[in-house]
Amino acid sequence: MIFDKDDFKAYDADLWNAIAKEEERQQNNIELIASENVVSKAVMAAQGSILTNKYAEGYPGRRYYGGTDVVDVVETLAIERAKEIFGAKFANVQPHSGSQANCAAYMSLIEPGDTVMGMDLASGGHLTHGAPVSFSGQTYNFVSYSVDPKTELLDFDAILKQAQEVKPKLIVAGASAYSQIIDFSKFREIADAVGAKLMVDMAHIAGLVAAGLHPSPVPYAHITTTTTHKTLRGPRGGLILTNDEELAKKINSAIFPGIQGGPLEHVVAAKAVSFKEVLDPAFKEYAANVIKNSKAMADVFLQDPDFRIISGGTENHLFLVDVTKVVENGKVAQNLLDEVNITLNKNSIPYETLSPFKTSGIRIGAAAITAREFGEEESRKVAELIIKTLKNSENEAVLEEVRSAVKELTDAFPLYEE
């Protein structure tokens, strides 16, 4: 039996109510977590489809089970659309997450114990770029590079000098909290100069790359990985791209049977439909508006001397704000904003002095509010509400004013049209 909503509600009221509460939370909150977005109803329909029933170990035309002709069509659609979007010769759409995509990329390029250079977490890198608590830092000998302490920008001369000293087998570029343009051609020059491979994790900026609004790493990286959510606005999952046929074979083997069994074909279907949306000209307009809204919010903070934007501004979908002149730390800021229905996350800043559980900063992203069709005016209003909240944390009357203003915005821009 395939449940409709009424069946579901009657069968498992506890779960139904929990999901309904999350829908209400998303509708009534302003979502600024940079890694989150709002998918289309088509993406949700594909992910909730009957494809969830089908096991399909292997790849199109090379499965270990029968009855896979239809899912072969689904997965091939996703593969071909991904290749078209990013101009890549090969694509693997099976990774369950960006972390698993990164794991498979490492397995395809290097051996355990090899030296790798990745961006320091506080400078904007990701856990899988060598953090000691991650499989990456435990399996490989990661050496971190950082941003310049004064400009808070990537210093390619310093990165080259460091690479010449440590002689890595692999250099990882890409970030989870870096608000400026990344020059992947310079990373490739450095990699070539020291005989290293280059891997790029473009998870955060993939949607901007797809829209032609950020330089693509695909022509320069030996392997490019990404998530399929964030700015790409698809389901939660991973994607691996390469132009090298031999590496493509290694990637496929690393994913299956290396670290995964059967692919989640319902999620692959959701990736396929989201890729079709990315190929629509409207997506480029969306991505352009994401950057405009990010800049609009950042400009409000730049005008207030009590806040400091890391690296001085933004050229993408996110930026970091040092809040320590106004509140104790980023965790306090995050919790205060939760109370007025504005959701974002505490975040370490370059050369952080506080623990990652407290942090000096917060990270603000524009992807989700732009999906709700907030414009630059609304984005500036959101930034003003954040500042108002943090500067009036003990004034309940002011906080109630903020809650009302948030409600006006979320009512005016519903999560989904009925």
From Swiss-Prot:
Names of required cofactors: pyridoxal 5'-phosphate
MF GO annotations: glycine hydroxymethyltransferase activity; pyridoxal phosphate binding
Organism: Streptococcus pneumoniae (strain 70585)
Reaction equations catalysed: (6R)-5,10-methylene-5,6,7,8-tetrahydrofolate + glycine + H2O = (6S)-5,6,7,8-tetrahydrofolate + L-serine
InterPro entries the record matches: PyrdxlP-dep_Trfase, PyrdxlP-dep_Trfase_major, PyrdxlP-dep_Trfase_small, Ser_HO-MeTrfase, Ser_HO-MeTrfase-like, Ser_HO-MeTrfase_PLP_BS, SHMT-like_dom
Primary residence: cytoplasm
Site, as annotated: Plays an important role in substrate specificity: 229
Location relative to the cell: Cytoplasm
Classification lineage: Bacteria, Bacillati, Bacillota, Bacilli, Lactobacillales
Enzyme class, broadest EC rank: transferase
PANTHER family linked to this entry: SERINE HYDROXYMETHYLTRANSFERASE, SERINE HYDROXYMETHYLTRANSFERASE 1
Signal peptide: none
Chain positions recorded as (6S)-5,6,7,8-tetrahydrofolate binding sites: 121, 125-127, 246, 355-357
Pathway: One-carbon metabolism; tetrahydrofolate interconversion; Amino-acid biosynthesis; glycine biosynthesis; glycine from L-serine: step 1/1
Amino-acid biosynthesis in keyword set: yes
Protein name: Serine hydroxymethyltransferase
